Regions:
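Membrane-embedded beta-strand positions in outer-membrane beta-barrel channels/transporters
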Residues: 74, 132-134, 178, 291, ...
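Intrinsically disordered, glycine/charged-rich N-terminal periplasmic/extracytoplasmic linker segments
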Residues: 65-112, 127, 134, 138, ...
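Terminal intrinsically disordered/low-complexity segments used for targeting and assembly
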Residues: 2-79, 237-296, 468-475
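Small/polar (Gly/Ser/Thr/Ala-rich) solvent-exposed segments
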Residues: 85, 105-127, 136-169, 185-187, ...
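Amphipathic alpha-helical coiled-coil segments
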Residues: 86-101, 166, 172-190, 200, ...
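Transmembrane beta-barrel architecture of outer-membrane proteins
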Residues: 70-72, 128-132, 176, 221, ...
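Metallo-beta-lactamase
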Residues: 236, 299-300, 378, 455
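Periplasmic alpha-helical coiled-coil/stalk elements that build and connect Gram-negative outer-membrane
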Residues: 154, 161-290, 399, 423, ...
């Protein structure tokens, strides 16, 4: 009866602790520090207003990338990619850890039967056995269990966000590789068409040389340029295979052909260009959203915030280690020295223990200091993450605008050089121009066509980078 009274007394003391300020302080909840400055995007003159509704980040990747073949490819990568599967497994591990942390509030129960045979001076053998059932329960008087549970929950949130980051990176990478394939296909078409034209020009030059109208130097120069186009065709085909292999690796499959649509048929949030009739990216028609409302949804910023949350609870748990730990124990069972038929004597035992650390060779103090420093370090990293996020948005916007502005110039340049090439070729046929002028016109036109295509690709890359920088691609 006295033991029971002592247990009740200890329990009462624990209940009293729940009402004191120290107990509440040790169980304090983390207050999010995710403050995004209003000027996170920068002060560029090209970025003055941020429409608050319909931000680009609110688009799911299926809404953002409307090309059916690209959608199918992204779905296949998300279903089979090794890195994403590993991230999903990491989430499951964190869920198991959180479940174990929640069960720490419950008592542990052990059944440890034992038996023995004994004899004194070769006398009769005495048999005995014990059948105890032991219960241990830690009292969360100073929030150690609570803080560890909350830290485990923060770890789970981090694992989930890391999965989102992997998912967004895969969406971005697949889209970029897909548009790279389209670019290479388009450049291969340009080079193939150029190959046919230059081959015809080369045959004309050979005929003129055979008739003594030009020197062999002209033929050699033309053939050299023609062979250069041939090598570019080989390089482009090789690059196509490399990109297809890279996508195959993302699919966790052996190298294979990647189906894609034709250049210019893929749809992205764009604006029709009134000058050329083409569709091109324009920051004026892209809703990016207010930084405080958009950037806080970026997975890397949420990851940094959850890391600070985990560090906060780890610091709380480290602080709780300075205070006593209280444990309740109980044992119930029976023992018998005369076999198993008669249960013999019933065993009952109950006790409470309190352990107050006095000297632990500085381990507790060191752990607390390390936890505090980790928390401070993560706070600084969070600020840097926000700065980096705003910088990425600014850079992507600048790239979009640059590609948009250059497109009209490239388009006009191609038109002018095509006219120059046709005119120069006609002049040479009439003997009013030489092969060097024709050769220069041909090479200039080819380079302008390739540059125009590359600029279109850079525009696509920029809008994808902006989409990811605003937190898109996770859903």
């Amino acid at each position: 009866m006295r033991k029971l009274t002592n247990i009740v007394t200890v329990a009462a003391v624990c209940l009293l602790l729940t009402g004191c300020s120290l107990y509440k302080e040790m169980r304090g909840e983390y207050q999010s520090q995710s403050v995004i400055p209003t000027n996170a995007y920068g002060t560029s003159q090209d970025i003055k207003e941020y429409p608050t509704n319909g931000s680009l980040a609110n688009y799911s990747w299926r809404e953002f990338f409307t090309d059916p073949l690209l959608q199918q490819l992204i779905e296949q990568v998300l279903a089979h990619n090794t890195d994403l599967n590993s991230a999903c497994i990491a989430v499951e591990k964190s869920e198991a850890s959180l479940k174990a942390a929640k069960l720490a509030y419950l008592p542990s129960l052990y059944f440890s039967p034992s038996g023995s045979l004994s004899s004194f001076d070769f006398g009769p053998v005495s048999k005995s056995y014990n059948m105890p059932l032991q219960l241990n329960m830690d009292i969360d008087a100073f929030g150690s269990i609570t803080n560890k549970k909350r830290a485990a929950n923060a770890l789970l949130l981090q694992a989930q966000v890391r999965e989102e980051i992997v998912r967004a990176n895969l969406v971005s990478t697949v889209a970029q590789q897909y548009y790279m394939l389209q670019l290479l296909d388009h450049q291969l078409e340009i080079l193939t068409a150029t190959d046919s034209l230059w081959n015809a020009s080369l045959e004309t030059e050979k005929t003129l040389w055979e008739n003594g109208k030009i020197y062999s130097t002209a033929v050699n120069q033309m053939e050299s340029s023609y062979l250069n186009v041939k090598t570019q065709i080989v390089d482009t085909r090789r690059n196509i295979r490399s990109v297809e292999n890279a996508i195959s690796r993302l699919l966790a499959e052996t190298p294979q052909h990647i189906n894609r649509s034709y250049w210019g048929s893929s749809a992205l949030p764009e604006h029709p260009d009134s000058t050329t009739g083409q569709r091109m990216f324009d920051t004026k028609f892209i809703k990016i959203g207010v930084p405080a409302e958009v950037l806080q949804n970026r997975p890397d910023i949420r990851l940094a915030n959850f890391a600070m949350e985990e560090a906060f609870y780890n610091t709380q748990a480290a602080r709780a280690a300075f205070f006593p730990s209280i444990t309740l124990q109980g044992v119930a069972g029976w023992t018998n020295r005369e076999g198993t038929v008669n249960p013999g004597k019933i065993l009952l035992n109950a006790m409470a223990s309190l352990t107050q650390p006095i000297f632990a060779r500085g381990t507790i103090k060191a752990n607390h200091k390390i936890a505090q420093l980790t928390e401070e370090d993560l706070q600084r990293k969070y600020v840097q993450t926000v700065i980096d996020a705003g910088n990425q948005v600014n850079e992507a916007l600048a790239d979009c605008q640059a590609a948009r502005e250059k497109y009209a110039y490239y388009h006009r340049q191609v038109e002018v050089l095509r006219e120059a090439y046709i005119g120069t070729h006609e002049l040479m046929d009439n003997g009013k121009s030489n092969y060097l002028e024709v050769l220069t016109a041909q090479e200039s036109l080819l380079n302008a066509q390739l540059s125009e295509a590359l600029n279109m690709y850079n525009g696509a890359q920029a809008i994808i980078a902006l989409y990811i920088a605003l937190g898109g691609g996770t859903k």
